[in-house]
Amino acid sequence: MFHTIIIVGNVGRDPEMRYTPSGQAVTSFSVATNRQYTNNNGETIKETIWFRVSAWGKQAEICNQYLKKGSKVLVEGRLTPDKETGGPRIWNGQDGTARASYEITAQTVRFLTSRAEAESGAPAADETAAPADEADIPF
C-alpha cells in the first residue's frame, strides 16, 4: 500500500533543526494552507489548516538554511498518524476548543519563494500575476 499527501502553503515560523543521537539531521516547521469558499448561505468562508512537517537528512539541512517564516513551499510526503489515536494529534487551544494537528514526514520540499523575494519580503510571483484566461492556455 502507498499513500502520499501534497500541500502548498506558507511556513508559519522559522524552522528548527536538531540531530538524532545517531547524528542524522531533522528539521521541523509548520505550514499553513488556506482555502476560501462560499457556503450555502452565500457567506465567504476562509479556512486555514496547519501541518507540522519533518524533513530528514540533507533535505533537513537545506530547509533549515533557506526556509523562514512566510516562505511559500510545496511539501510532498506521508501523513504520520498519532501513535495513540491513529489519526491527527488532538489538543486543546488556549481558548479551550479542540484542535487537530496533522503531521507530515516530508519526502520532497520545494521552495516556491525565490531568494530575491525572500530577502525583500515581496509577494511570490503567482500572488501578483493576473489570472490566466482559459483561451491563453497552450493545450
PLM region descriptions:
Residues W56-I90, T97-A98, T113-R115:
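Beta-rich strand-turn-strand
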Residues T4-E47, K83-P88, A100:
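Core FKBP-type peptidyl-prolyl cis-trans isomerase
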Residues F29, Q36-V73:
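Small beta-barrel nucleic-acid-binding modules, principally OB-folds
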Residues M1-F2, R18-G23, N39-G42, D95-T97, ...:
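Acidic, gly/ser/pro-rich intrinsically disordered tails
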Residues I5-R13, V31, K69-P81, A106-V109:
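OB-fold and OB-like beta-barrel modules that bind single-stranded nucleic acids
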